[in-house]
Amino acid sequence: MAVSEEPTYTSTSSESMGGSEILRVEDLHTSFFLPIGELQAVRGVSFSLKRGRSLGIVGESGSGKTVLARSIMCLNLGSNVKTSGSAFFDGRDLLALSRREMRRLWGTEIAMIFQDPMTSLNPMVKIGRQVIEHLRQHKNVNRREAKQTALDLLNEVRIPEAESRIDRLPHELSGGMRQRVSIASALACEPSLLFADEPTTALDVTVQHQILNLLSREQRQRNMTMVMVTHDLGVIAGRTDDTLVMYAGKVVEQASTDEIFEKTQHPYTEALMRSIPRTSQASHTPLAAITGRPPVATHLP
């Protein structure tokens, strides 16, 4: 599929929903400067998100969705990275803050659940200690209080026999249990905005369903704003209020999630919808694939 120069399809119905604005992104660009040239990962993305709502960011691998989330959180580090535009969180432009100011926000007001819990958790440190250290760094609690809170969080994310598992190392847990620990750590300081970047990657279908339901439950109970990054439209169906569809670093469609599924307007979103496998399909029926290939981000037209 070639890069489309069609305008972004935007619905205004979700914009009128209640709640104050917690996040507003304006004309965000992120480029990586490589030996082969400038890789334009995010190109002029703008959107806003109301407090307590959930947003899905979907697109193929390489569409820029993860880079967008990391750019908002100021996590794209390196001398070869350039980010411009604005990302206002509770009225503060995150891109204008110093690293010290951002460190005060990371984990406390804004948190992220990463794709692979084996790389986001320290393999040499017991899981309970990792949550405890996170609490003690950002909250005025002693070790005993932090340990009890960590245990409560592990129980809350439904880790069986949390009392005995709190002293386990990450490799001693299954992939699903490790992701639950990552969620507990992200929720420890009660952030108002949570990014979940492909939180069910490499998990089996049953565990995926459990993790997604857990995130939805925590988001509702805490009245937390959540951004779910995924390549799978099935992940956001019935779980997010609004959706952005990204292609080649741009948002090509944004609307309420119900509208995305009921009356898709952009050809790329339609192609994504057609590519979803359905149980109603006859056996041996070829899967619908998106024709062509994504554009190379260093050689965009």
Each language-model region and where it sits:
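A short, flexible loop at the N-terminus of ABC-type nucleotide-binding domains that lies
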Residues: 18-22, 31-44, 75-81, 98-102, ...
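A short, proline-enriched helix->beta-strand linker immediately N-terminal to the Walker B motif
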Residues: 188-192
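P-loop NTP-binding/switch modules centered on Walker-like glycine-rich loops
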Residues: 60, 74, 195, 199, ...
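Short catalytic/signature loops enriched in Gly
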Residues: 9, 16-21, 160-164, 256-301
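Conserved ABC ATPase "signature" region
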Residues: 92-93, 145-164, 273-274
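Conserved ABC ATPase signature
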Residues: 168-173, 177
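Conserved ABC transporter NBD signature motif
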Residues: 81-93
